[in-house]
Design a protein with these regions (language model features):
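Short beta->alpha transition motifs characteristic of CBS
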Residues: 5, 104, 111, 122-128
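Long, continuous compositionally biased terminal/linker segments
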Residues: 38-81
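Glycine-rich acetyl-CoA-binding "A-motif" of GNAT/NAT acetyltransferases
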Residues: 119
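Short glycine-enriched loop/turn motifs at secondary-structure junctions
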Residues: 1, 62-65, 104
């Protein structure tokens, strides 16, 4: 199951304002915003319903950045197995398995760039 998807935008503030209005009829609102200082990348805004950000926009300055797709893993061992298999298949490391506390205390994810440079993630939200 897809956990969340994220894609680059050319003008972060403009796109954030657009999605705030466009997604409102779907009961989607701004759930989380992550700054560059918090995670070392361009700012990102996560929209969703019921407190779960599953639709992310981010980046600044171009649409040539990779797509980001996160897939739910049943447990942390599965996240680890995904990472190992993806690297063995020719993927490039984009974040080894581990806690990403800037999202929430139990966010355990691993990130791999596919052959085209897209950021593929496996994530588990449950405690160890």
């Amino acid at each position: 199951m897809i956990d969340h998807i994220g894609f680059p935008v050319s003008d972060y503030e403009r796109s954030k304002a657009f999605y705030l209005k466009a997604l409102a009829p779907l009961d989607y609102g701004l759930v989380m915003e992550v700054t560059q200082e918090e995670h070392g990348h361009d700012p990102a805004a996560g929209f969703g319903a019921n407190g779960k950000p599953d639709f992310w926009i981010g980046g600044e300055g171009g649409l040539d950045k990779p797509l980001h797709v996160a897939i739910v893993a049943k447990d942390r061992a599965t996240v680890d197995a995904f990472y190992t298999a993806a690297i063995a298949a020719g993927g490039r490391d984009n974040g080894a398995p581990g806690i990403r506390a800037h999202y929430h205390p139990n966010y355990y994810g691993a990130f791999v760039l596919d052959p085209d440079g897209h950021n593929i993630e496996a994530v588990c939200h449950t405690p160890a």
